Amino acid sequence: MRLRLIAVGSRMPRWVEEGWQEYVKRLPAELSLELVEIPLNTRGKNADVARLIRQEGEAMLARVQPGERVVTLEVEGRLWSTEQLARELDRWRLDARTVNLMVGGPEGLAPEVCARSEQRWSLSPLTLPHPLVRILVGEQIYRAWTVLSGHPYHK
């Protein structure tokens, strides 16, 4: 099974990379979790933010192949318990398509990305810093896998 986290933003602090890698390395070989970073466009005082978001969205969608699943991470998405995420992960595995988890920039996701989405997932009703979202997604995917495999990590 192949999961891809496509996230706007690059040049994250070392602790973010280390946190992400900690959970990626724990996953079994049959569950691949890849990070694809989309550069954040420069936001100046007079920037056309709508245009920048659209460009970031185009770059995100360019990484998605036809037929692949798109899941957007949005505050307005569905909140899943660990067990619900484990069920989704199992469905995704049975579906046998690459799953792209999309995380937008500071202003969110482009409408085109949301329109392509098959599912909307919310980690929390709180506004979370994007670097932390990467680690949370990695940990939650790992935790969901442990539920499915009967591993004692999730008790």
UniProtKB/Swiss-Prot annotation:
Specifically methylates the pseudouridine at position 1915 (m3Psi1915) in 23S rRNA. S-adenosyl-L-methionine binds at residues 73, 104, 123-128. Belongs to the RNA methyltransferase RlmH family. It is found in: Cytoplasm. The keyword tRNA processing does not apply. One of its GO terms (molecular function) is rRNA (pseudouridine-N3-)-methyltransferase activity. One of its GO terms (cellular component) is cytoplasm. Its EC number is 2.1.1.177. Homodimer. This is Ribosomal RNA large subunit methyltransferase H. It is an enzyme of class 2 (transferase). It catalyses: pseudouridine(1915) in 23S rRNA + S-adenosyl-L-methionine = N(3)-methylpseudouridine(1915) in 23S rRNA + S-adenosyl-L-homocysteine + H(+). Keywords: Cytoplasm, Methyltransferase, rRNA processing, S-adenosyl-L-methionine, Transferase. InterPro entries: Alpha/beta_knot_MTases, RlmH-like, tRNA_m1G_MTases_N. Pfam families: SPOUT_MTase. The gene is rlmH. Its main location: cytoplasm.
